[in-house]
């Protein structure tokens, strides 16, 4: 079964826009779980413009589903993850100033660096995932670095999907087959939505997890959070 992890960064962005604690990030996360989410994802950035370090500590003891922390592996990020010990850590190659993740790792060029970082998390018993483009070579080098999983960066799929779904998903199928052949797990995320998720799933039904935030929270403005989560879960059947 493919798991749905809800990225709650946008909830934190809304809270931070006015100060105070509305909406309450922890309550929204717990409600997401109650409404059927299989996990919660956060991406704490150095400037704390959405998720704050304090949020990460507040969430960890209360969540009943999988907790996934994603981010660039700076010393501060590594320290946070090792202290909090989430179920999964996802490494992304973001510059701190980026609005959102917009590329995967060059796992070949960064093999030594990633290997050293992944070893720290693996030794702590934290499942590891590396954010990569739909390129079999990048998947192969992520496996060589010691990643338990890769997360496929799906923005190119989402962009190309409206014009030619078959062509859009083709490179992702090949990358997914490579991961399966190598025996590592497979996640996917970025710009997946109610429009394109089911087609992606039908072509790659062995994907372990999808992480969705912006589209899901946007849909919830119209449909409500509970119905929205159920709609996304329906896309994974």
From Swiss-Prot:
MF term (GO), any: pyridoxine 5'-phosphate synthase activity
Residues at which 3-amino-2-oxopropyl phosphate binds: 7, 18, 191, 213-214
Active-site residues, Swiss-Prot/TrEMBL: 43, 70, 190
One of the GO BP terms on file: pyridoxine biosynthetic process
Binding-site positions, 1-deoxy-D-xylulose 5-phosphate: 45, 50, 100
Pathway in which this enzyme or protein is active: Cofactor biosynthesis; pyridoxine 5'-phosphate biosynthesis; pyridoxine 5'-phosphate from D-erythrose 4-phosphate: step 5/5
SUPFAM superfamilies, sorted: Pyridoxine 5'-phosphate synthase (SSF63892)
Cellular localization per UniProt: Cytoplasm
Name of the protein: Pyridoxine 5'-phosphate synthase
Species the sequence originates in: Bacteroides thetaiotaomicron (strain ATCC 29148 / DSM 2079 / JCM 5827 / CCUG 10774 / NCTC 10582 / VPI-5482 / E50)
Protein encoded by which gene: pdxJ
């Amino acid at each position: 079964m493919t798991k749905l992890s809800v990225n709650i960064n946008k909830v934190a962005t809304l809270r931070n826009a006015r100060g105070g604690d509305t909406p309450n990030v922890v309550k929204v996360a717990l409600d997401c779980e109650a409404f059927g989410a299989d996990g919660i994802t956060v991406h704490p950035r150095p400037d704390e413009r959405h998720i704050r370090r304090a949020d990460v500590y507040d969430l960890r003891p209360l969540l009943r589903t999988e907790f996934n922390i994603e981010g660039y592996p700076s010393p501060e990020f590594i320290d946070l993850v090792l202290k909090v010990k989430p179920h999964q850590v996802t490494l992304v190659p973001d510059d701190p100033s980026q609005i959102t993740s917009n590329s995967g790792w060059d796992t070949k060029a960064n093999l030594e660096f990633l290997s050293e970082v992944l070893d720290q998390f693996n030794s702590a018993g934290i499942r590891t995932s590396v954010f990569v483009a739909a390129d079999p070579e990048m998947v192969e080098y992520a496996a060589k670095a010691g990643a338990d999983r890769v997360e496929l960066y799906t923005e190119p799929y989402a962009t190309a999907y409206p014009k030619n779904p078959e062509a859009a998903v083709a490179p992702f199928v090949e990358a997914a087959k490579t991961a399966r052949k190598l025996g590592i797990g497979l996640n996917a995320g970025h710009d997946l939505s109610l429009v394109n998720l089911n087609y992606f799933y039908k072509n790659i039904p062995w994907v372990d997890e999808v992480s969705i935030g912006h589209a899901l929270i946007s849909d919830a403005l119209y449909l409500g959070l509970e119905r929205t989560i159920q709609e996304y879960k329906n896309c994974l059947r």
